[in-house]
């Protein structure tokens, strides 16, 4: 059943709002239902006022707009001008949906890498601890293991509060949420109450949007100044994380996590072991320790598990409970997913690594697992940070024995141009194999691999599409790799 509320409760200072009852707040005119208030604010390319006719035709009972109106666009009688409307949307949506984030334990996770893994592992841990958990992030929104894709790492502000209201109504007790730098910069999480704010790391990404690392870091830091944050879990092995920790407001509980034994750490991992069966370490909190043995692969998954441990510690779980549940957590789709490795086949790993730091971490982690060659397949997205393309080439050439460059969501950009940008970063580009057809590149990489080799397919992870010229074509790295491995097995059987 849809909610309804007098608009005056959301805009008590606006006289024109007194006699209107609304059933929803909507920014996209195509999503308006009868009884909704249509919210028109300035976008990156066009003002929402340009879509008033569509919103009214679909049954909008109120038009709220942020002045000034763009030149040449007429404002209909009865439309309500609200100065600073965008900045008020979070509080309005929070109130309209009955303050949903205050009814659940809310954990917001920000950082360049590790957000999705941390969020999904935390929700899985809560689930195993008997907590009805939910997530919001790159993989979608929903109760644990019931995700619905949204197309955003962090949904737009009105959609986000609606999602949180639905999660509350569905019985969620705790929500783990990815909070992107774009979301923080654009006010998408305004009005959300966070119990725990989490920082994973800060490395190069999204500089096409933020301009430089300083502004990128400033956007991430906004999460920790958010209303009502009770605790902050911060990776103090990261220099920016250390700055965050020491800059926290008084009254915020500080939980530093470290794999390097940092003196500011409250939660640490010691005595690490890595092999093809997974990872192991001692979880140390204060003077106490407990063993963790996990089937997850990769050194960076120690960081992810340690971050989850920090959150659970901040929520007052005991060391014994934390260590036990960490040992039960399973891999996440598209994050260091292992395929093959049996009957003389190479091991194939599918991972979402699409930044220089993430690619470097994955390759470095796999190098400790491999006894043969390390073969890397990667590309770079179109219409995104061009500066990282050559950097990823440097990382791949330095850490892999064989490199294949391919397409990875070229979008509206020329794929040959993207490849040229990548190749510019190689010292010996003549040794790099280029195959823009991603399926063919995956097949070629697996085809040249032998038993003992590891093939990394990097960049897309969980994604089930290849975006070319505005069209998302069905594509899944895991499915392609499994088909190639199955064909290899069939050939061996015939022989």
Swiss-Prot record:
Modification after translation (UniProt): Carboxylation is probably crucial for Mg(2+) binding and, consequently, for the gamma-phosphate positioning of ATP.
Binding site residues for meso-2,6-diaminopimelate: 384, 408-411, 459, 463
Residues annotated as binding UDP-N-acetyl-alpha-D-muramoyl-L-alanyl-D-glutamate: 29, 153-154, 180, 186, 188
Function: Catalyzes the addition of meso-diaminopimelic acid to the nucleotide precursor UDP-N-acetylmuramoyl-L-alanyl-D-glutamate (UMAG) in the biosynthesis of bacterial cell-wall peptidoglycan.
Molecular-function GO term, any one: ATP binding
Catalytic activity, reaction form: UDP-N-acetyl-alpha-D-muramoyl-L-alanyl-D-glutamate + meso-2,6-diaminopimelate + ATP = UDP-N-acetyl-alpha-D-muramoyl-L-alanyl-gamma-D-glutamyl-meso-2,6-diaminopimelate + ADP + phosphate + H(+)
Species of origin: Xylella fastidiosa (strain Temecula1 / ATCC 700964)
Taxon lineage: Bacteria, Pseudomonadati, Pseudomonadota, Gammaproteobacteria, Lysobacterales
SUPFAM superfamilies: MurD-like peptide ligases, catalytic domain, MurD-like peptide ligases, peptide-binding domain, MurE/MurF N-terminal domain
GO biological processes: cell division; cell wall organization; peptidoglycan biosynthetic process; regulation of cell shape
Protein name in UniProt: UDP-N-acetylmuramoyl-L-alanyl-D-glutamate--2,6-diaminopimelate ligase
In-chain residues carrying the UniProt-annotated modification N6-carboxylysine: 220
Pfam families: Mur_ligase, Mur_ligase_C, Mur_ligase_M
Annotated PANTHER family: MUR LIGASE FAMILY MEMBER (PTHR23135), UDP-N-ACETYLMURAMOYL-L-ALANYL-D-GLUTAMATE--2,6-DIAMINOPIMELATE LIGASE MURE HOMOLOG, CHLOROPLASTIC (PTHR23135:SF4)
């Amino acid at each position: 059943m849809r909610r309804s509320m007098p608009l005056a409760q959301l805009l008590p200072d606006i006289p024109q709002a007194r006699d209107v009852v609304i059933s929803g707040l909507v920014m996209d005119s195509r999503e308006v239902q009868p009884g909704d208030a249509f919210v028109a604010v300035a976008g990156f390319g066009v003002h929402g006022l340009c879509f008033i006719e569509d919103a009214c035709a679909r049954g909008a009972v109120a038009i709220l707009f942020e002045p000034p109106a763009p030149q040449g666009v007429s404002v209909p009688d009865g439309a309500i001008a609200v100065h600073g409307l965008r900045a008020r949307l979070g509080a309005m949506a929070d109130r309209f949906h009955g303050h949903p984030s205050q009814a659940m334990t809310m954990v917001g996770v920000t950082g360049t890498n590790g957000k999705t893994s941390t969020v999904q592992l935390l929700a899985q841990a809560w689930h195993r601890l008997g907590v009805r958990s939910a997530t919001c992030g790159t993989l979608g929104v929903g109760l644990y293991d019931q995700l619905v894709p949204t197309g955003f790492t962090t949904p737009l502000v009105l959609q986000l509060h609606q999602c949180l209201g639905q999660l509350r109504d569905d019985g969620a007790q705790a929500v783990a949420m990815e909070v992107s730098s774009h979301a923080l910069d654009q006010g998408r999480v305004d009005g959300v109450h966070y119990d725990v704010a989490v920082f994973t790391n800060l490395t190069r990404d999204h500089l096409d949007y933020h301009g430089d690392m300083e502004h990128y870091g400033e956007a991430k830091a906004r999460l920790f100044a958010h209303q009502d944050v009770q605790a902050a879990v911060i990776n103090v092995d990261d220099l920016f994380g250390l700055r965050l920790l020491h800059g926290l407001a008084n009254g915020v509980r500080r939980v530093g996590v470290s794999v390097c034994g940092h003196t500011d750490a409250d939660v640490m991992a010691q005595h690490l072991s890595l092999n093809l069966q997974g990872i192991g370490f001692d979880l140390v909190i204060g003077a106490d320790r407990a063993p963790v043995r996990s089937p997850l692969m990769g050194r960076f998954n120690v960081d992810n598990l340690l971050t989850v441990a920090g959150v659970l510690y901040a929520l007052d779980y005991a060391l014994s409970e934390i260590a036990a549940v960490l040992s039960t957590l399973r891999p996440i789709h598209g994050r260091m997913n292992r395929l093959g490795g049996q009957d003389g086949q190479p091991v194939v790993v599918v991972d979402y690594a699409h930044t220089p730091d993430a690619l470097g971490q994955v390759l470095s982690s796999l190098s400790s697992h491999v006894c043969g060659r390390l073969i890397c397949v990667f590309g770079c997205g179109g219409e995104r940070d061009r500066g990282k393309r050559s950097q990823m080439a440097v990382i791949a050439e330095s850490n892999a024995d064989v490199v294949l460059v391919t397409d990875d969501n070229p979008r509206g950009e020329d794929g040959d141009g993207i490849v040229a940008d990548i190749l510019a970063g190689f010292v010996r580009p003549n040794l790099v194999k280029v195959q823009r057809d991603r399926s063919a590149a995956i097949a070629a990489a697996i085809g040249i691999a032998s038993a003992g080799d590891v093939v990394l397919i990097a960049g897309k992870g969980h994604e089930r599409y290849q975006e070319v010229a505005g069209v998302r074509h069905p594509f899944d790295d895991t499915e392609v790799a499994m088909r190639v491995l199955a064909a290899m097995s069939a050939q061996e059987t015939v022989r």
